[in-house]
Amino acid sequence: MAAKDRLPIFPSRGAQTLMKSRLAGATKGHGLLKKKADALQMRFRLILGKIIETKTLMGQVMKEAAFSLAEVKFTTGDINQIVLQNVTKAQIKIRTKKDNVAGVTLPIFEPYTDGVDTYELAGLARGGQQLAKLKKNYQSAVRLLVQLASLQTSFVTLDDVIKVTNRRVNAIEHVIIPRINRTIEYIISELDELEREEFYRLKKIQDKKREARKASDKLRAEQRLLGQMAEAQEVQNILDEDGDEDLLF
């Protein structure tokens, strides 16, 4: 096993416990990130469907608005001067809200009407009905544009977050967890090798102690035998000396 395929750590029981704890944390984090990615993916697909639906509806609304504008121009003539004379401030404004999806903040744009209708009396002389229809159609178009902008902003935000989350999930699944597993295997193999070496060392020590004990027992036996032989020789010498004296007298 190459050193780059595992974490640089000294093999010990404490290191093994630490790596098992890190493995449990990485596995739990992988599961949580996977659930987050799935939740974001579901919301992503939902927003994508709404974008397609809104764009389809947007085409129809803009077509009706363009047709209404043509009707107004045909009925009342050029209304540019009327609009410019009555314009003061925007009637449709936007407020921003926030939505939280699995820890991701998504901006939401909502249109609202502020103040009175500036062009309420415009076109009463002629073409008032067509002008009212034109205002209604373009207000619907503006609201759809705001809704579409909100959806597309959320779409882009979710797309970026999903890519980052998937990269983290893949990194944990294919890099971090396998590296921790290889580190644990390395620690276990090194500890087993140390245990075998310790067992062999203890066995050699026991063998040496056994040999030393046998040598000591053998030496004591020899010394005891020599002592017994010396005592027997001494007794024999005493007996021999006693016999010689009897012969002389």
From Swiss-Prot:
Keyword vocabulary terms for this entry: Hydrogen ion transport, Ion transport, Transport
Gene3D superfamilies: 1.10.287.3240
Short name of one Pfam family: ATP-synt_D
GO CC annotations on file: proton-transporting V-type ATPase complex
Record GO terms (molecular function): proton-transporting ATPase activity, rotational mechanism
Record's keyword annotation contains Zinc-finger: no
BP-aspect Gene Ontology terms: proton transmembrane transport
PANTHER family, per database record: V-TYPE ATP SYNTHASE SUBUNIT D
Subunit structure, interactors included: V-ATPase is a heteromultimeric enzyme made up of two complexes: the ATP-hydrolytic V1 complex and the proton translocation V0 complex. The V1 complex consists of three catalytic AB heterodimers that form a heterohexamer, three peripheral stalks each consisting of EG heterodimers, one central rotor including subunits D and F, and the regulatory subunits C and H. The proton translocation complex V0 consists of the proton transport subunit a, a ring of proteolipid subunits c9c'', rotary subunit d, subunits e and f, and the accessory subunits VhaAC45 and ATP6AP2.
Similarity remark: Belongs to the V-ATPase D subunit family.
Function: Subunit of the V1 complex of vacuolar(H+)-ATPase (V-ATPase), a multisubunit enzyme composed of a peripheral complex (V1) that hydrolyzes ATP and a membrane integral complex (V0) that translocates protons. V-ATPase is responsible for acidifying and maintaining the pH of intracellular compartments and in some cell types, is targeted to the plasma membrane, where it is responsible for acidifying the extracellular environment.
Protein name: V-type proton ATPase subunit D 2
Lineage, opening ranks: Eukaryota, Metazoa, Ecdysozoa, Arthropoda, Hexapoda
